[in-house]
Amino acid sequence: MTNIRKTHPLMKILNDAFIDLPTPSNISSWWNFGSLLGLCLIMQILTGLFLAMHYTPDTSTAFSSVAHICRDVNYGWFIRYLHANGASMFFICLYAHIGRGLYYGSYMFQETWNIGVLLLLTVMATAFVGYVLPWGQMSFWGATVITNLLSAIPYIGTTLVEWIWGGFSVDKATLTRFFAFHFILPFIITALAAVHLLFLHETGSNNPTGIPSNMDMIPFHPYYTIKDILGALLLILTLLALTLFTPDLLGDPDNYTPANPLSTPAHIKPEWYFLFAYAILRSIPNKLGGVLALLLSILVLIFIPMLQTSKQRSMMFRPFSQLLFWTLVADLLTLTWIGGQPVEHPYIIVGQLASILYFLLILVLMPTAGLIENKLLKW
C-alpha cells in the first residue's frame, strides 16, 4: 500500500515541499530564515486577527481602542506587543534572508529573487500602513510625511496624494483605508510566498559553496525540519524576551501621545527597520531626487543578478567580495543610525557619504571586485 502522503493530491504538495524535498546536505543556519519568515507571517496574521476584533479604525476612537486592548482585553497587552515586536523580528529575518542571498549568490535564481523583492516591498507597505493604525503622534506625522512624498511626482503628484488621503489631509478616510490595506496585504504576502516557494522548488536550493546542489542531496525531513525547529525556538525565545521584558524598546515614545494635527513632534522618524531608507531619502536636498533614491535603495536589488561579473556564484572563496559585502552591512547599520538622528552637522554629511557608498558598493565596487577575482584565478 502506497503512503497517503505520496498519493493524496493535497498531501502530495505538502510532501514535496516539506518532507521528501531533496535538499543540499551542506546548507548552514543562514538557510533557516526562510522558514522563520513563514513562522513570523503566521504569527503576525494570528495576532493581527485578534487585535482586529477589538480595534476600531476611526480617528476619534482608534487610540482609545488600542489602550482598551492593552488594559481591558484578556492578554490584550501581550497580543498587541507580540504583534508590534513580531514586526521587528520579521524585518530582522527578512534582512538576514536577503543578506544570505547576496552573500551566497542565491539571486541567480532570478524568478525566486524577483518575487522576493516584490515580497519585501509588500511587507514594507504592510508595516507602514500598520504603523498608522494606533493613531499616535508618530503614526499621524509618519503617514503625513511619507504619503506627502508622492507630491514630488510631476504633474499628477498633488492629485495622487489627495486621492490616497481621501481628502485634503490625513484624516478619518485615510485611517479607514489604511486599516483595510493592513488587513488584506498579509494574505497577498502569503500568496506571493507560495509562488516564491514554487519557483524555488523548480530549481532546488542553492548552497554555501555556490556549486550545483544536485551532487549530494538529503531529504528535508527529518534533517532540516529539526534544524528549523531549533531556529524557530530561538526566534520565539527572543520575541518573548523582547515582548515580556522591554516591549517598548523598539517603539517611539511619541506614539503614546494621541495624534494632534496642530503639534508636530520634534523628530519625525519611522520604525527602526525603515531608518536606512529614510536616511537615504533625507540625504538628498531635493524632494523628487530623495524619493527616487528611496525607491532605488530597495529596487537596486532587482539589478543585482545582472551585475554578477564573477565566475564563482558564492562569495565563500572570494575574499575581496567578502570585504565589500561586510562593508555594505556596516554601511547599512550606519544609515540606520543616521536615520534616527536629527538633521544637523555632522549627521547630514555622514548620511550623504553613507548613501553614496551604499549605491557605489552595489553598482560599481562589487561588480569590479568580481572582475578582479576572475583575473586572479588565471594567475
From Swiss-Prot:
The organism of origin for this protein: Lagenodelphis hosei
Keywords: Electron transport, Heme, Iron, Membrane, Metal-binding, Mitochondrion, Mitochondrion inner membrane, Respiratory chain, Transmembrane, Transmembrane helix, Transport, Ubiquinone
Protein's name according to its UniProt entry: Cytochrome b
Membrane topology, from the record: Multi-pass membrane protein
Family: Belongs to the cytochrome b family.
Cofactor(s) required for function per UniProt: heme b
Cofactor binding description: Binds 2 heme b groups non-covalently.
Record-linked InterPro entries: Cyt_b/b6_C, Cyt_b/b6_C_sf, Cyt_b/b6_N, Cytb/b6-like_sf, Cytochrome_b, Cytochrome_b_C_euk/bac, Cytochrome_b_N_euk/bac, Di-haem_cyt_TM
Positions of heme b b562 binding: H83, H182
Known partners and oligomeric status: The cytochrome bc1 complex contains 11 subunits: 3 respiratory subunits (MT-CYB, CYC1 and UQCRFS1), 2 core proteins (UQCRC1 and UQCRC2) and 6 low-molecular weight proteins (UQCRH/QCR6, UQCRB/QCR7, UQCRQ/QCR8, UQCR10/QCR9, UQCR11/QCR10 and a cleavage product of UQCRFS1). This cytochrome bc1 complex then forms a dimer.
Residues that span the membrane, as ranges: 33-53, 77-98, 113-133, 178-198, 226-246, 288-308, 320-340, 347-367
General remark: Heme 1 (or BL or b562) is low-potential and absorbs at about 562 nm, and heme 2 (or BH or b566) is high-potential and absorbs at about 566 nm.
MF terms in GO: metal ion binding; ubiquinol-cytochrome-c reductase activity
Binding-site list for a ubiquinone: H201
Free-text function comment from the UniProt entry: Component of the ubiquinol-cytochrome c reductase complex (complex III or cytochrome b-c1 complex) that is part of the mitochondrial respiratory chain. The b-c1 complex mediates electron transfer from ubiquinol to cytochrome c. Contributes to the generation of a proton gradient across the mitochondrial membrane that is then used for ATP synthesis.
Keyword Metal-binding: yes
Binding-site positions, heme b b566: H97, H196
GO cellular component terms listed in the entry, alphabetical order: mitochondrial inner membrane; respiratory chain complex III
GO biological process: mitochondrial electron transport, ubiquinol to cytochrome c
PROSITE patterns for this protein: CYTB_CTER, CYTB_NTER
Subcellular location: Mitochondrion inner membrane
